[in-house]
Amino acid sequence: AIPGEAVMHDRPVGRGYVRLRCTGAHPWPGVSETGAIHPAHEFHYASLEGLPPGLPHAYEMVRGHGLDGINDGLIFGNMVAGFTHLRNVANTPWVGRFVEFVRSRRSQMMAAGC
């Protein structure tokens, strides 16, 4: 489980179009080059609070709120958790990369006898 607490608010914490800069920490190979900027959107009434410092993030917020006004895409194990919604378009082909990642993890687990 993510080491934090989801808190609901009366008003939206983040809403509208955002721009994300890739940090290079994304666990799905080839999702994007470090520093690449992607358009996306967010709309959420929740925030994630009480996270320990130093957890890696897949994205820095150029515009928008994300998880904390600075970052989005918390990386925890094999998971990328965030509030931003990315479209699968030519400059952000995340669906194919996700499927590749799942297949590689499955192969690794089968090879390890799991």
Regions found by a protein language model. Name each.
Residues 22-75:
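Catalytic beta-strand/loop cores that center a nucleophilic Ser/Cys/Thr
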Residues 71-114:
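Acyltransferase
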